[in-house]
């Protein structure tokens, strides 16, 4: 089980990896293809983010797999209830994965 200090450190490490990812050509290309389309973000950006997170959690004893990331997230969620800083860092990670997108123009015609 992660300690509070390890939880904070691991989330800071993930944030660093995500910031590096955002500067990469692959991420920027995917982002330019997405625009405000959340479905495209899930298809193109989310896999890049998950891969970066899986690689980051290996430094804290978890495997670079969906199972390892799931176990890590379970432990972080448990810590977030005990530690406000872990909760804040989790929120920051979440906002990097799914940033707020501007609402579509209300006057634009909706596709049928």
Where do the PLM segments sit?
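Terminal, compositionally biased segments used for targeting/anchoring and flexible tails
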Residues: 1-112
């Amino acid at each position: 089980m992660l300690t509070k200090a390890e939880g904070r450190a691991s989330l800071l490490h993930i944030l660093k990896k995500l910031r590096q990812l955002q500067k990469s050509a692959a991420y920027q290309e995917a982002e330019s293809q997405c625009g405000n389309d959340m479905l495209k973000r899930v298809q193109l950006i989310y896999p890049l983010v998950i891969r970066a997170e899986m690689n980051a959690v290996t430094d804290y004893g978890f495997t670079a797999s969906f199972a390892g990331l799931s176990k890590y997230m379970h432990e972080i969620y448990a810590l977030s209830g005990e530690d406000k800083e872990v909760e804040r860092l989790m929120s920051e990670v979440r906002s990097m994965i799914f940033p707020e997108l501007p609402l579509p123009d209300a006057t634009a015609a909706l596709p049928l």
